[in-house]
Amino acid sequence: MNGVIMMVIAIVVLGGGYLFYGRYLEKKWGIDPNAKTPAYELEDGVDYVPADTNIVFGHQFASIAGAGPINGPIQAAIFGWLPVLLWILIGGVFFGAVQDFASMYASVKNKGRTIGYIIEEYIGKLGKKLFLLFCWLFCILVVAAFADVVAGTFNGFVDDDAGTVSKVAANGAVATTSMLFIVEAVALGCILKYAKLNKWVNTAIAIVMLVAAVAFGLYFPMYLTRETWHILIFIYILIASVAPVTMLLQPRDYLNSYLLIFMIAAAIVGVFVANPSCNLKAFTSFNVDGSYMFPILFVTIACGAVSGFHSLVSSGTASKQIKSEKNMLPVSYGAMIMESMLAVIALIAVASFADGEAAAQGLTTQPQIFAGAIANFLEVIGLPHSLVFTLINLAVSAFALTSLDSVARVGRLSFQEFFIDDDTDMDHLPLYKKVATNKYFSTVITLVLAYLLAKVGYAEIWPLFGSANQLLSVLALIACAVFLKKTKRQGAMLWIPMVFMMAVTFTALGMTICKLGGQFMTTGLSLGNTLQLIFAVLLLILGVIVAIQGIKKLTEKKEAQADKVEETTILE
């Protein structure tokens, strides 16, 4: 096996999955290109804003992709290249892309509402409350972690063992480029909104802005401390998560999506030119140093195969920007397929190194291994290794920031929706609900808690992120499966992914509880492990409650009347 064969297999499977299985889902569920989407029906200039396909795709792709599809396959490579490749391809086509498409489809068919509202409408209010509370806490954790990672990536200074402080040009370059992206995004947003140019002209402008920002960042690095970046990042998130999507979110993600696409294209060219050999075993063992392939492989490789976080983006922000129902497939299913391709490239990258070779070259983190491999590939055609390495590192590092305001916006929406039911009279809310549903209050409380968590140590509960993320996938699949059944659509294709991910998540949480519970009974636990144990138990209880409610609805002999949304016709 070599890199080219892996790449060809991936292109055929992923491309075929989109062309055949994606379109099959479209036909079975029913797409009405003439239907008025929530982006038009509820247009408010803030969250509900119709946008062209390429712009919404840019938002979806930039929000869900980044370091995740790079880190996961490289970490999971301890089990061998074959199980990793199979899970990326099968998971991407039949699990992840289906979940993302179903989440967006259900949201668009229900006035752009989140999965929480779908659960209330078709499963029950208790399930909705539990889901939204979980989503809100999940978003707080992700914002805290990503903000800390970004602050570290942007940190312009480093201390050596002797206490000498020196500047880090690479970090400074990433910081400058990322800040320029924000400034350019505002300018591009004005162009997109007011100039009304041809989409190809807009694309050309975006590419010029992208190149200019990268070049300027390389030549003029910005040096600020980690603590300063922490404060600046949270100020940015506060503004970005309440600003109209046309002002920053849409154009910024549009810009960043091109950076990611260029990186993927360059990597594919590099693989075909260099044809790297595969230095990994096809399969090592089911148990590697105490880590069992089931469920660890399926929790570790989330982005790139199936990730619950994607359902929050699909139903929380992207669905409110869909201009036509026919755009849902390329935006949701298509973005996931692209991310799976990035995950395959990451697998090829780590497989290209012989045992110990990456560490010998000073490549210690997953993004560094990825960047080092791509630089090796492109060096074959004469591109400078150091330049390519820097550019790839810059591209990967810059993407952590792109997810931050999307996650914060989803967290804000989850907090607001927690206090509103489907039958709530918005004109006669009690005072506490008026305060809680205010977008500024809900954003501030979400970000204040995230900031405090980032400062006191989110790392104590971060090991549960993988299980929590996949639990989101389980809940989203359950909600979508029930929605499809209640609206007389064919949703059986969601059952296998739903049951499999349920087994993965509950097994992972159960193993964590057994391990930490055993330690607690014998030697006691540290504060961090105690928090992990508590959160693992709470997550398992939450998952079981919502799963039982959903399965009851799915197995009802007498189906409820068709959906309560304004649609009766299913297109064949």
Indicate where each model-derived feature is located.
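Extracellular loop-to-transmembrane helix junctions
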Residues: 2-19, 76-107, 116, 175-185, ...
